[in-house]
């Protein structure tokens, strides 16, 4: 149990180090890859998740996936809260590590980059704030994401799951990520959002808890539950 919780914690932290790190690299003043664009960022998210899965193996690194596995009977319901907490804490620690790595660039950017942009390096935000529509986007993105992972996991070729999940993240990010930034994962959003709230970042905005709780906080669980029920009912996966 402890070993698996640590794997969830470290796997999520590594995912966030890649993901939040690429946003900092792309946005902050003085980095070598500033202005590289969304393809650069989305590709790094996909590859970063692939590497995390290769290193830590059979991990969820996403409370929405934990919920899906509990619904399908692959995990005990008693593990839902411990796994989810470990993943969120991993998200916090991963974001703190990125902040330490980019501390000089945060300092250089304090008077140039808006507080909202700084917040958005850590957590997701909608392009157009419309909470019902934002909720639907995150619900649907997560439904596709969890359904895709469950389908990929049925293929028993060694190494296919990490690669397939990375490609799935890339496709969702490119095709469906524009409205909300495709969190699909409470730990991906809430962990870095907590880090943003507690870190001594100069001239920072509030952490927008309303959006964080309603959209990336709740919608991924609804999408994951529907995905688990759909994949079990339609394809017999479970």
Swiss-Prot record:
InterPro entries: Aquaporin-like, MIP, MIP/AQP_LacticAcid_Trans, MIP/Aquaporin
Motif (NPA 2): 185-187
Membrane topology reported for the UniProt record: Multi-pass membrane protein
Keyword Isomerase annotated: no
Disrupted-gene phenotype: Cells lacking this gene show a decreased lactate transport ability.
Pfam families: MIP
Cell membrane listed as a keyword: yes
Motif NPA 1: where in chain: 62-64
Alphabetized GO MF terms: glycerol channel activity
Signal peptide range in chain numbering: none
GO cellular component: plasma membrane
SUPFAM superfamilies the record matches: Aquaporin-like
Keywords: Cell membrane, Membrane, Transmembrane, Transmembrane helix, Transport
Localization per record: Cell membrane
Transmembrane regions listed in the UniProt entry: 2-22, 39-59, 80-100, 135-155, 158-178, 211-231
Family: Belongs to the MIP/aquaporin (TC 1.A.8) family.
Function in brief: Transporter that facilitates the transmembrane diffusion of water, dihydroxyacetone, glycerol, urea, H(2)O(2) and D/L-lactic acid. Is involved in the cellular racemization of lactate and lactate metabolism, but has likely a more general physiological role. The transported molecule is indeed lactic acid and not the lactate anion, in agreement with the assumption that, with very few exceptions, MIPs (major intrinsic proteins) only facilitate the transport of uncharged solutes.
Name recorded for this polypeptide: Glycerol uptake facilitator protein 4
């Amino acid at each position: 149990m402890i070993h698996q919780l640590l794997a969830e914690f470290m796997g999520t932290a590594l995912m966030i180090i890649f993901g939040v790190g690429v946003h900092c690299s792309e946005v902050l003043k003085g980095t070598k890859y500033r202005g590289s664009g969304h393809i650069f960022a989305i590709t790094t998210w996909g590859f970063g998740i692939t590497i995390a899965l290769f290193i830590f193996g059979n991990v969820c690194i996403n409370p929405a996936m934990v919920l899906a596995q509990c619904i399908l009977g692959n995990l005990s319901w008693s593990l839902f809260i411990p796994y989810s907490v470990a993943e969120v804490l991993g998200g916090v620690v991963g974001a703190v590590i990125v902040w330490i790595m980019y501390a000089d660039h945060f300092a250089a950017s304090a008077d140039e980059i808006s507080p909202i942009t700084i917040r958005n390096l850590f957590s997701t935000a909608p392009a157009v704030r419309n909470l019902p529509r934002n909720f639907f986007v995150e619900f649907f993105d997560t439904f596709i994401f969890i359904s895709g992972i469950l389908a990929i996991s049925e293929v028993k070729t060694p190494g296919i799951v990490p690669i397939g999940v990375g490609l799935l993240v890339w496709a969702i990010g490119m095709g469906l990520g524009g409205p909300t930034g495709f969190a699909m994962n409470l730990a991906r959003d809430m962990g870095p959002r907590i880090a943003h709230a507690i870190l001594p970042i100069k001239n920072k905005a509030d952490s927008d808890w309303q959006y964080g709780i309603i959209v990336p906080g709740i919608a991924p669980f609804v999408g994951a539950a529907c995905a688990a029920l759909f994949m079990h009912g339609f394809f017999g996966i479970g």
